[in-house]
A protein has these predicted regions:
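Solvent-exposed interhelical
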Residues: 87
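Extended, alpha-helix-rich binding/interface surfaces that flank or overlap catalytic cores
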Residues: 92
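Membrane-anchoring alpha-helices and their flanking helix-loop junctions
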Residues: 1-84, 96-156
Length: 156
């Protein structure tokens, strides 16, 4: 059994920081070089429902994790695999919700440059967080995690 220092995924950065940093950078570029990409009415009609769905998914994720009695931190040991709630549909509901929220905010701000940078956050999260988490979970839970991984998609 690994000690507590070894019993974690080794994520490169906290995912909320990855998303927030990328979004803020995109919004700052857009402030310097203003570029809208949608009519305001369409931006609102797309952005608000997407923001609502992202926040609801994030809340469902948090409730499920707390109810299951494990952690959502990539820097703490995971006690068991959670397969209920949003984890029945995606292995990464928190990161999916962060992607939805980022997209919604960038859309509501009508910030073209934030949308252009959007792929950076999920890509960095996948390479620097998700792939490390998956390796950690495979090592810690073996066949149980591999079976779950075979049944449920990484994103959607």
């Amino acid at each position: 059994m690994p000690n507590d220092e070894q019993d974690k995924s080794g994520a490169v950065a906290p995912p909320p920081l990855i998303y927030l940093g990328t979004l803020v950078f995109g919004l700052l570029i857009n402030k310097r070089f203003p570029t809208a990409f949608l009519p305001r009415t369409i931006a609102r009609r797309l952005g608000w429902p997407l923001l609502s769905a992202g926040v609801l998914l994030l809340g469902w994720f948090e409730w499920t994790i707390r109810h299951a009695g494990t952690t959502d931190s990539p820097y703490e040991p995971v006690s068991h695999i959670v397969t209920e709630g949003p984890f029945h549909y995606t292995r990464n509901p928190a990161y999916l919700s962060m992607t939805m929220i980022y997209t919604a905010i960038a859309t509501l701000a009508n910030a073209f440059w934030a949308i252009v940078l959007l792929p950076v956050a999920p890509l960095v999260t996948q390479r620097g967080v998700i792939e490390r988490e998956e390796q950690y979970l495979e090592g810690k839970f073996g066949e149980e995690y591999l079976s779950y991984k075979a049944r449920v998609r990484r994103w959607i």
